[in-house]
Amino acid sequence: MERRNFLRSAALAGTALFIDPQCLMARRRPDIGAWRGFNLLNYFTAGYPEPFREEEFQWMAQWGFNFVRLPLSYWNWSRPGEYYEMDEHVLQDIDRAVEWGRRYGIHVCINLHRAPGYCVNPPAEPQNIFEDAEALDGCAHQWTVFARRYRRVSSRHLSFNLLNEVARVKAEDYERIVRRLVGAIRDVSPRRLILIDGLDWGGRPLLSVPDLPDIIQCGRGYQPMLISHYEASWTFGDKPMPIPRHQLTWPLDADGRHYDRQYLLQMQEHSWTPLLQQGGRVFVGEFGCHNRTPHAVALAWLRDNLDVFRQLGWGWALWNLRGSFGILDSGRDDVEYEDFHGHRLDRQMLRLLQENL
């Protein structure tokens, strides 16, 4: 899209993207270790899109948070497999989220959770980005559109997260995709800060790209899954859980081992030390606890994770703000919720997060 057309549509949408000329010259690196925030799921799946809400940016800023990740499905602006037609109306709503982030001091990270040719969640994409050149070309095109659209927005305010939780893929194949997508972005926006999820669902780093500047690698904070995803149908299906809910604890003894804060620390250090030794940087793009885990257990587990992230100097984003992992409208049956602007607020969880800002 030509620049004049974009500026016209952005103005009609009531959104003025922030232009910071000095940022184009400076090499100031964002303090990613200080990022604290949430994932916003408004365009996480197709079929149920929900416009971003300015008041949520206001609330996050008032509570002290400074980061949001936007996990997006490209099916919201393109039809499956039709990579070169992008709905301007949806893109304008993403424009508004970027602008609200700047306005309220919240860094915005755009993530293609469902990208052309890849999604960790079902249903499968019609093409495979690791095998089909057409899908890779389409994904590169869509990132080029975002790069061009926001090329004058500082990396202090905006970053790109290429794909979500790459799994069952060889490191060399992932490297090839990363280099292609980074190249597509940097051809338009040479200094854009880019986040890449680690291999194996964000469980370990991609160690073959230390030459790429301004790259952050993203981990996860979901272990052990028995705690974070207790009775989550997309993880365990309809299988009975190995531990009854009323017997679930943190720390936890299960599978013949002991899980506690030390386990969380050792797991993260073991996974990410090789990247840190290269001078790489780590951000926890997702962590959180599903609403079927008893609330007291969830809080104890979250507290230990937050303490580990603080010890390691890592920023984090809770999955999610609103929803079964979040602080708003989480649907837990063992929480005394507080009415908050028509939402049900888990004040205890919010306070725990605020203690770790």
Language-model features, listed with the residues they occupy:
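N-terminal export signals
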Residues: N5-M25
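Active-site mouth of glycoside hydrolases
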Residues: D31-L193, G198-P205, D339-N356
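Short amphipathic alpha-helical segments and helix-helix/interface helices
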Residues: F57, V98, V182, L207, ...
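Short, hinge-like loop/turn segments at secondary-structure boundaries
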Residues: D87, P126-I129, P210-P213, W234-F236, ...
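Active-site region of glycoside hydrolase catalytic domains
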Residues: A133, D137-H258, E269-H290, Q311-W314
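Alpha-helical scaffold elements lining the catalytic groove of polysaccharide deacetylases
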Residues: Q262-L264
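Aromatic-rich peripheral "rim/lid" segments of glycoside hydrolase catalytic domains that contact
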Residues: P294-L357
